Amino acid sequence: MTAVQRSVGRSVGAVITGMVAGVALTLVTDVVLHKAGLFPPWGQPVSDGPLALATAYRAAFEVVGSYVAARLAPDRPMWHAMVAGFVGFVVSIAGAVATWNRGPEFGPHWYPVALIVIALPCAWVGGRFREMQLRG
């Protein structure tokens, strides 16, 4: 295996690991909040308050996931953070398209739009944290 192949492999691994970290944190938090009764049972409509909370922790976890991608990157940490963010952006668009007007159990339209809007700024913040860490 050449040095370039190793670098590409590490880059792909960094982005995937960062994304998995963000998704895992989100899913665990979702389950905990459902079990605690702060969110309604699965498949039931969710009001604005819990969705605002979900938006806030998803934003925080997107920053964490992007930071992980940047931290594990072999070089260009911001680029890796933004790639992870772009994938999140695309997945958020796909989720919005798939659930738009599908019923109240998917929440109001502002929620998927918010997830789309925050994806890239959160990725930038995660990458920026890593850049600041590298500068000392």
Task: Provide a role label for each language-model segment.
Residues M1-G136:
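Juxtamembrane/disordered regions of integral membrane proteins
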